Each structure stands twice: as structure tokens, then as C-alpha cells.
């Protein structure tokens, strides 16, 4: 019985000390991750502090960038992210242009 209580106590203490991805705070509908500093290949999101707090940034990993709209993502000023920002702006312009071409056109009732 004593060994059972000792084992339970050890597991309860270890559960408090585990530093893994068990309690990672997510942002942007579980697309981004709250971190102190984003990696160069990750995208930094505008107003991420509202979801992650003032001391952390909301970072969108490179493999999940397609799941989040381009116009809400802002990059930090590094050489790699400047190219990404230019690509994102171009993609946004193309998306806006294609959406404006999808506007409904009036049809005359006679024909």
C-alpha cells in the first residue's frame, strides 16, 4: 500500500514538471502557436497579443500558412520574411482582383 501511494505521489509531481507540448497555448483557431519569439520561417500575426498576451507573439508555422488568410498575417523585417511579405501582398492583390471580377452583372429581364 505504501509503494502504491509513493508511486501516485511521484506521478503527480512529475505531471507538474513535464515540459512538453501538452499545454501549448494556441491562437487563430488552433492555426498559430503562442511563443516568446517567432522563428524566421514563421509568420508573425498582427494583434496576436490579444490572444497570447503582451509578452508573447502568435506565430503561424510555415506548413499551416495556407490554412490562414494572407491579409491578416504580417511578417517581421528580415531578409527571408521580406520576400514572403512581397509574395503575400502579390497574392492578396491577385485575390482581390479575382474577387472583383466575380461581381454579379445585371441581367435584363427581356433576354
UniProtKB/Swiss-Prot annotation:
Residues annotated as signal peptide: 1-20
GO cellular component terms given for this protein: extracellular region
Cellular localization per UniProt: Secreted
Broad class of where this protein is predominantly found: secreted
InterPro entries: Beta-defensin
Keyword Cell wall biogenesis/degradation assigned: no
One biological process term in Gene Ontology: defense response to Gram-negative bacterium
Top-level taxon of origin: Eukaryota
Region of interest called In vitro binds to LPS, mediates antimicrobial activity and inhibits LPS-mediated inflammation, as start-end residue ranges on this chain: 21-63
UniProtKB keywords: Antibiotic, Antimicrobial, Cleavage on pair of basic residues, Defensin, Disulfide bond, Fertilization, Secreted, Signal
Changes after translation: O-glycosylated; glycans contain alpha(2,3)-linked sialic acids.
Presence of the UniProt keyword Transferase in the record: no
Tissue-specificity statement: High-level and epididymis-specific expression. Expression is down-regulated in infertile men.
S-S bonds: 27-58, 34-52, 38-59
Family of this protein: Belongs to the beta-defensin family.
PANTHER family named among the record's database cross-references: BETA-DEFENSIN 123 (PTHR15001:SF3), BETA-DEFENSIN 123-RELATED (PTHR15001)
The protein's assembly and partners: Homodimer or homooligomer; disulfide-linked.
Disease annotated for this entry: May be involved in infertility. Homozygosity for frameshift truncating mutations are associated with reduced sperm O-linked glycan content, impaired sperm mobility and a reduced live birth rate. However, for one common mutation the change in sperm sialic acid levels has been challenged.
Role of this protein: Highly glycosylated atypical beta-defensin involved in several aspects of sperm function. Facilitates sperm transport in the female reproductive tract and contributes to sperm protection against immunodetection; both functions are probably implicating the negative surface charge provided by its O-linked oligosaccharides in the sperm glycocalyx. Involved in binding of sperm to oviductal epithelial cells to form a sperm reservoir until ovulation.
Record's protein name: Beta-defensin 126
UniProt source species: Homo sapiens
Gene, per the UniProt record: DEFB126
Amino acid at each position: 500500500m505504501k509503494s502504491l501511494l509513493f508511486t501516485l505521489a511521484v506521478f503527480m509531481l512529475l505531471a507538474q514538471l513535464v515540459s512538453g507540448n501538452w499545454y501549448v497555448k494556441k491562437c487563430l483557431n488552433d492555426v498559430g502557436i503562442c511563443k516568446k519569439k517567432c522563428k524566421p520561417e514563421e509568420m508573425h500575426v498582427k494583434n496576436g497579443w490579444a490572444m497570447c498576451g503582451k509578452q508573447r507573439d502568435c506565430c503561424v508555422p510555415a506548413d499551416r500558412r495556407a490554412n490562414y488568410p494572407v491579409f491578416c498575417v504580417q511578417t517581421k523585417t528580415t531578409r527571408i520574411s521580406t520576400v514572403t511579405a512581397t509574395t503575400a501582398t502579390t497574392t492578396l492583390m491577385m485575390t482581390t482582383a479575382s474577387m472583383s471580377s466575380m461581381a454579379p452583372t445585371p441581367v435584363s429581364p427581356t433576354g
